[in-house]
């Protein structure tokens, strides 16, 4: 992870992210938006940065960290849900993280909702680490836990930017204000995402 390799990693992430929808919310206006809620199971996930067939970096910038590093205002964070299970902890009640996600959204001027997949739930048939759905996907839907999270956050009426990390097509089944498909963007993925959200660079994937 020398300086040169990190620069290449950042450039790859910047050039690969795809802006699928923008109702005018992007780039985010820092003079108007003072609080951002970063919500979702992929917000702090390094697995959502790595993908498959990856090397190991000495430092990963998650989506949450990238936004925190770039944004001078207040950043709220809520995990919202497990990537695909109905609870984050085995001893918790089902859906126990949705309430904090809704509260974070209600107290923000805009929401960055980080959903999608990672290599633990999509991959080749026979992958030993894949306990969700190994091999070809049966459909393009997100896991139910994330579909419920999206619905609850959207119901707050706050502007929502969905950031979908996945190595394949995904149907988010909603109408957000903006939608970014970021693939598995690598160790500098969080930095690249923040640059796009705030207009430092234009998405070109």
Task: List each model region and its residues.
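C-terminal non-catalytic regions of proteins with extracellular/luminal or membrane-system context
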Residues: 3, 7-205
């Amino acid at each position: 992870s020398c300086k040169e390799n990190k620069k290449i990693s950042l450039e790859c992430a910047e050039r690969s992210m795809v802006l699928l929808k923008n109702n005018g919310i992007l780039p985010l206006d820092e003079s108007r938006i003072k609080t951002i809620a970063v919500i979702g199971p992929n917000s702090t996930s390094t697995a959502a940065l790595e993908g498959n067939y990856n090397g190991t970096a000495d430092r990963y910038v998650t989506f949450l960290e990238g936004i925190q590093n770039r944004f001078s205002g207040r950043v709220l964070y809520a995990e919202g849900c497990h990537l695909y299970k109905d609870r984050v902890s085995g001893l918790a009640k089902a859906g126990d993280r949705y309430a904090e996600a809704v509260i974070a959204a209600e107290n923000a001027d805009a929401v960055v909702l980080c959903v999608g997949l990672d290599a633990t739930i999509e991959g080749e048939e026979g992958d030993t680490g894949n306990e969700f759905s190994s091999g070809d996907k049966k459909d393009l839907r997100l896991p139910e836990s994330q579909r419920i999270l999206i619905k609850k956050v959207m119901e707050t009426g706050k502007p929502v930017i969905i950031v979908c990390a996945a190595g394949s097509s995904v149907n988010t089944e909603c109408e957000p204000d903006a939608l970014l498909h970021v693939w598995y963007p690598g160790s500098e993925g969080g930095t690249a995402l923040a640059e796009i959200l705030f207009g430092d660079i234009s998405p070109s994937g």
